[in-house]
Amino acid sequence: MKAVLIMGSTFDEPHAKKITDKLDDYGISWEQHAASAHKQPLKVLEILKNNESEKDLVYITIAGRSNALSGFVAANSEFPTIG
């Protein structure tokens, strides 16, 4: 199992740290990215493309305000998205 965290911005780091600490506790591998669905949609799509060959994967999105990131990731990936 692998978790890919995508934050809307680096300002979301403190919240992401809480999540990655728990993933570490459970022995789940993870990677973390900062990419805005509004300002960097191509970067988000690149992250999704780079992980499309994974077998067991979940996306965890962290974004404030409109939270377009969760919907954008869910709409462009076959893997579950938690946002």
Feature locations, PLM:
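Glycine-rich phosphate/diphosphate-binding loop of Rossmann-like nucleotide-binding domains
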Residues: M1-A37
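Short glycine/serine/threonine-rich phosphate/pyrophosphate-binding segments
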Residues: D12-K17, P41, S66-F72
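Glycine-rich phosphate-binding loop
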Residues: I47-G83
